[in-house]
């Protein structure tokens, strides 16, 4: 399996079931859900509960989520949608993904940077390959005026939760050997320079993100290749 497809299969599993412990009608057109693990839920995220779509009004990490009360929530659980996934060079991502999709349809985004270098083992080795991964977990709040002073709690913290869940799934995959990894919080990753300062624009959208870097060893799969 190609590395880009393997990572896509991991991202597709990022659909945790969230338990709602309590629902309070705030009497102001909103309702607050008590939730122990908010994962990557953040303000303005679209979530679906019992077939109804809500835009998150506010949240407290791993405590509660406030949404409109047009339809009061009566179920105990809901499934969080997996982040969007894209791979390619920065120019490909900007041209094919950032420009072609509206804001509501592309964030949060998990972006696997290419080109990828895979080091393959001998055919008699139980290991398949070492793959060098550089993955960005990205989100944008540039058009939300009230987020200027709160980007860290509203963007970086949820993105770290998204990264942690991804790593948990990656490590639990049967073909993955134990690995270490580096994490870097990236503010305004839409602007990039190889030297000092931010001088060269890569993405049209101004983004905040979390960068994951690791070399992961994958074992050969037992699946039939017939």
Which residues does each predicted region cover?
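Well-ordered, non-membrane alpha-helical segments in soluble/globular domains
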Residues: 1-12, 154-169
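Short, charged interaction patches at domain edges and termini
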Residues: 1-16, 118-130, 176-226
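Small/polar beta-strand repeat architecture
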Residues: 18-27, 36-39, 48-89
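Structural beta-strand segments of beta-rich domains
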Residues: 31-33
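Loop/turn positions that initiate beta-strands
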Residues: 42-44
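Short beta-strand-to-loop capping motifs
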Residues: 69, 137-140, 216-218
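Short, solvent-exposed beta-alpha or beta-beta edge segments that form flexible loop/patches at the rim
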Residues: 84-150, 189-206, 224
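Acidic, metal/cofactor-coordinating or nucleic-acid-engaging core segments within structured domains
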Residues: 161-183
């Amino acid at each position: 399996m190609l590395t880009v497809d393997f990572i896509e299969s991991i991202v597709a599993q990022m659909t945790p079931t969230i338990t709602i412990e309590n629902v309070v009608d705030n009497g102001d057109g909103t309702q607050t859900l008590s939730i122990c693990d908010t994962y990557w839920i953040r303000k303005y995220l679209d979530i679906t509960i019992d077939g109804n779509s809500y835009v998150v009004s506010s949240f407290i990490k791993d405590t509660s989520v406030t949404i409109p009360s047009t339809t009061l929530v009566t179920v105990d659980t809901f499934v969080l949608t997996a982040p969007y996934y894209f791979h390619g060079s920065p120019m490909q991502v900007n041209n094919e993904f950032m420009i072609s999709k509206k804001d509501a349809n592309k964030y949060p985004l998990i972006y696997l940077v290419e080109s990828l270098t895979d080091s393959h083992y001998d055919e008699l080795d139980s290991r398949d390959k070492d793959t060098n991964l550089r993955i960005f977990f990205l989100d944008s709040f540039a058009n939300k005026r009230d987020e200027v002073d709160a980007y860290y709690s509203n963007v970086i913290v949820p993105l770290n939760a998204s990264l942690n869940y991804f790593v948990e799934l990656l490590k639990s995959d049967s073909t993955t050997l134990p690995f270490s990894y580096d994490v870097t919080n990236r503010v305004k990753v839409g602007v990039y320079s190889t030297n000092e300062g931010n001088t060269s624009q890569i993405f049209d959208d101004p983004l905040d993100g979390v960068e994951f870097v690791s070399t992961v060893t994958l074992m050969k799969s037992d699946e039939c290749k017939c």
